């Protein structure tokens, strides 16, 4: 094969100009190997190189510089062949590499079809940055396949330290009408920082983080990082068992945690020991992480996401997060993460106006912006955007073995007029305020999750009375596994914040929740939202002095654990944190050991005992979502601030739950019950082990055959002030 004149190698000026400014849809049509009428030509662009040689086995042929940092050579052979490039930059040793522009597209036609239809359930395998190895005639070529969806761009390039952030070096090709641009770059592997240089129709260059990046630089840096996982999971037994668990009939108590401030400075790897031990000791069945996807502003607590596929690098690597989740599974504890598909921040290096146009966000500002939060709203009606989000849900379940997604701000998605004044929202096609596209997205997401990952949970933070949030999609519901009971939370906290002397006038705030308790599959949440923004901590909401605050918290928690519904408690409340929570410092662990620390220790001990009793007494969890699991024994004793109800299990078991929410003890309080004989005391918040008043209570109470309040039996018991007792029926 004999080199020919460089004059035969020139690129047409129009194409060269587009390549020069990185707005060519097909750089592969000019770079790499191409057959000609009388042979073949190879071209390569190597910015700043002083020499480029074609390597054919043991032969090296100097390529001709033809301007614009392009080197070319013409050969007599018209048949395709494998080769390498030997590139020399000033002052550096030569580098031998495969040519990026000889590789076939890394996405197939089925991939692009599924993406355009919004049905690619493993989107992360084909978009973003995926490390790959190709077998060639001259040996293996290892590198990274880059692909990005940017349909409005006129050119896209991969930029990074490996090419001096120069968009002319690694221009990507467009895969037809799919809107996807792709390029395989040899010798690029894990640890490389990169972005996509987007050339917009308006003539601007926008350097963007990869929407599908699996890792990002530590904020405030904004680059994406190539990453590859070699983690070996140890939780196969847990994952197999998860698919068989019926959440409706099993105990579920969730410890909500912000990983960065639980204990300051802890990494995922350190939390895999410290946090796991702590949660296991308290007896929780699940832990819920506030958002762990990458986010630029720590003060958002993770709820303004910039990298939906990237675990935040604040606390370690993706594999270290996998290790943390694996450690929870080894202790029999499920892991839920907060997931934010409702909106995203306007940072110009992230998703916002990604290719110069409204792409991920809705183009109409009346639907595309959330003014309260200063964010953009996803365009749920666009198939590729739905695919991005649905696949993201599957990604966390598949790649990180999470057991559930708590979906944030669902109400803001469901209503077109959410937090909008007249004239700031557009009705749907039927003239209503329901966001039909968001409804369709949520139904699709839930149905897909349940089909692909049986046993995985989806939990809605939904603050309105939208019907059928947890009803199946085939029956017109949204299809969530569970819904936060915001009404219960608001009424309960409002009641317990009042002085006992005034509570009799607010008795219905506690009883009203049972009117609708079984209309959805509810979680009772006391979350981070209730201890921030000037609301104070639970401790500070309780009226009275230290003793009364501690007693109030113990009674509140007992009421929560007895009430129908699964449980969620935010970190710090289990020790009676006195100040409201801030992400800027760790929990005040010293409160347990400091002055009056016994009261805080008592609250922690009670939470441990509540979780234990909740698991052991089937009546407390088996019929959380059925009216057959609950009976009022005393709902109307407002004058004494007393509530009594019975929880029922499938096996006929019963748990009598007594709450005295006043400052006055009732030494001989009579209650009608359904079961005669003995009722055994299994929990007493007034006990000395919780630093209560330790009023002496018998281990059992007896129920006699005397009709009372519609029940065939009557029992008489001592109900101490500001306390709760659980009794189980023994017959």
UniProtKB/Swiss-Prot annotation:
The record's InterPro entries line, in alphabetical order, gives: A-amylase/branching_C (IPR006048), Branching_enzy (IPR037439), GlgB (IPR006407), GlgB_N (IPR054169), GlgB_N_E_set_prok (IPR044143), Glyco_hydro_13_cat_dom (IPR006047), Glyco_hydro_13_N (IPR004193), Glyco_hydro_b (IPR013780)
SUPFAM superfamilies on file: (Trans)glycosidases, E set domains, Glycosyl hydrolase domain
Q: What is its EC number?
A: 2.4.1.18
GO MF, one annotated term: 1,4-alpha-glucan branching enzyme activity
Question: Which key words tag this protein in UniProt?
Answer: Carbohydrate metabolism, Glycogen biosynthesis, Glycogen metabolism, Glycosyltransferase, Transferase
Pfam families assigned to the protein according to its UniProt record, in alphabetical order: Alpha-amylase (PF00128), Alpha-amylase_C (PF02806), CBM_48 (PF02922), GlgB_N (PF22019)
Q: Which GO terms describe its biological process?
A: glycogen biosynthetic process
Q: Where is the active site?
A: 408, 461
Spell out the reaction equation it catalyses: Transfers a segment of a (1->4)-alpha-D-glucan chain to a primary hydroxy group in a similar glucan chain
* CDD domains given in the database record: AmyAc_Glg_BE (cd11322), E_set_GBE_prok_N (cd02855)
Please provide, in alphabetical order, the Gene Ontology terms of the cellular component aspect for this entry: cytosol
Q: Which domain of life is it from?
A: Bacteria
State which pathway it belongs to: Glycan biosynthesis; glycogen biosynthesis
Q: Report the sequence similarity comment from the record.
A: Belongs to the glycosyl hydrolase 13 family. GlgB subfamily.
Functional summary from the UniProt entry: Catalyzes the formation of the alpha-1,6-glucosidic linkages in glycogen by scission of a 1,4-alpha-linked oligosaccharide from growing alpha-1,4-glucan chains and the subsequent attachment of the oligosaccharide to the alpha-1,6 position.
How it assembles, according to the record, is: Monomer.
Q: Could you tell me which HAMAP family the record lists for this protein?
A: GlgB
Instruction: Tell me the protein's name.
Output: 1,4-alpha-glucan branching enzyme GlgB
């Amino acid at each position: 094969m004999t080199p020919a004149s460089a004059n035969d190698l020139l690129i047409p000026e129009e194409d060269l100009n587009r390549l020069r400014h990185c707005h060519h849809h097909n750089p592969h049509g000019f770079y790499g190997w191409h057959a000609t009428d009388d042979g073949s030509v190879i071209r390569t662009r190597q910015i700043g190189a002083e020499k480029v040689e074609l390597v054919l086995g043991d032969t090296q042929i100097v390529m001709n510089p033809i301007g614009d940092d392009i080197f070319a050579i013409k050969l007599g052979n018209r048949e395709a062949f494998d080769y390498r490039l030997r590139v020399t930059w000033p002052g550096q040793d030569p580098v031998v590499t495969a040519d990026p522009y000889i590789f076939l597209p890394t996405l197939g036609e089925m991939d692009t079809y599924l993406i355009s239809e919004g049905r690619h359930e493993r989107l992360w395998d084909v978009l973003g940055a995926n490390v790959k190895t190709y077998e060639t005639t001259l040996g293996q070529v290892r590198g990274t396949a880059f692909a990005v969806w940017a349909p409005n761009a006129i050119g896209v390039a991969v930029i990074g330290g490996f090419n001096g952030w120069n968009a002319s070096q690694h221009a990507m090709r467009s895969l037809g009408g799919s809107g996807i641009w792709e390029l395989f770059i040899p010798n690029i592997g894990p640890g490389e920082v990169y972005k996509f240089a987007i050339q917009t129709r308006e003539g601007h260059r926008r350097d963007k983080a990869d929407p599908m990046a699996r890792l990002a630089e530590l904020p405030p840096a904004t680059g994406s990082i190539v990453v590859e996982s070699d983690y070996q999971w140890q939780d196969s037994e847990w994952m197999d068992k998860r698919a068989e668990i019926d959440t409706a009939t099993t105990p579920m108590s969730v410890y909500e945690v912000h990983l960065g401030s639980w204990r300051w400075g802890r990494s995922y790897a350190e939390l895999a020991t410290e946090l796991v031990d702590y949660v296991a000791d308290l007896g929780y069945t699940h832990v819920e992480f506030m958002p762990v996807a990458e986010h630029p502003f720590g003060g958002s607590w993770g709820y303004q996401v910039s990298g939906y596929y990237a675990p935040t690098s604040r606390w370690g690597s993706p594999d270290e997060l996998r290790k943390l989740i694996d450690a929870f599974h080894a202790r029999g504890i499920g892991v839920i993460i907060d997931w934010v598909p409702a909106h995203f921040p306007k940072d110009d290096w992230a998703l916002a106006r990604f290719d110069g146009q409204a792409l991920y966000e809705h183009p109409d500002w009346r639907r595309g912006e959330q003014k309260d939060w200063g964010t953009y709203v996803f365009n749920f009606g666009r198939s590729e955007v739905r695919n991005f989000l649905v696949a993201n849900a599957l990604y966390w379940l598949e790649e990180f073995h999470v057991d559930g997604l708590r979906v944030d701000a669902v109400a803001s998605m469901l209503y077109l007029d959410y937090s909008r004044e007249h004239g700031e929202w557009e009705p749907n096609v039927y003239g209503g305020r329901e966001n039909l596209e968001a409804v369709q997205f949520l139904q699709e997401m839930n149905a897909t999750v349940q089909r692909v990952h049986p046993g995985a949970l989806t939990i809605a933070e939904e603050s309105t009375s939208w019907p059928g949030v947890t009803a199946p999609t085939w029956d017109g519901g949204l299809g969530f596994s569970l819904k936060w009971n915001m009404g219960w939370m608001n009424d309960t906290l409002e009641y317990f914040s009042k002085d006992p002397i005034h509570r009799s006038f607010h008795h219905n705030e506690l009883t009203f929740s049972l009117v609708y308790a079984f209309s959805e599959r509810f979680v009772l949440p006391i979350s981070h939202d209730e201890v921030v923004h000037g609301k104070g901590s639970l401790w500070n909401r309780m009226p009275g002095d230290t003793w009364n605050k501690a007693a109030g918290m113990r009674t509140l928690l007992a009421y929560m654990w007895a009430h129908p519904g699964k449980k969620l408690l935010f970190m710090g409340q289990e020790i009676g944190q006195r100040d409201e929570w801030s992400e800027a410092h760790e929990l005040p662990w010293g409160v347990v050991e400091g002055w009056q620390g016994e009261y805080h220790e008592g609250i922690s001990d009670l939470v441990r005992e509540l979780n234990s009793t909740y698991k052991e007494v089937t009546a407390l969890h088996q019929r959380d979502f059925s009216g057959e699991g609950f009976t009022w024994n005393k709902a109307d004793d407002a004058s004494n601030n007393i509530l009594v109800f019975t929880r029922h299990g499938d096996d006929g078991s019963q748990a009598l739950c007594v709450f005295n929410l006043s400052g006055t003890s009732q030494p001989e309080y009579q209650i009608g019950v359904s079961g005669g004989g003995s009722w055994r005391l299994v929990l007493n918040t007034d006990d000395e082990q919780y630093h209560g008043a330790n009023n002496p209570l018998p281990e059992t109470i007896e129920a006699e055959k005397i009709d009372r309040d519609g029940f065939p039996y009557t029992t008489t018991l001592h109900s101490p002030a500001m306390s709760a007792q659980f009794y189980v029926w023994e017959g």
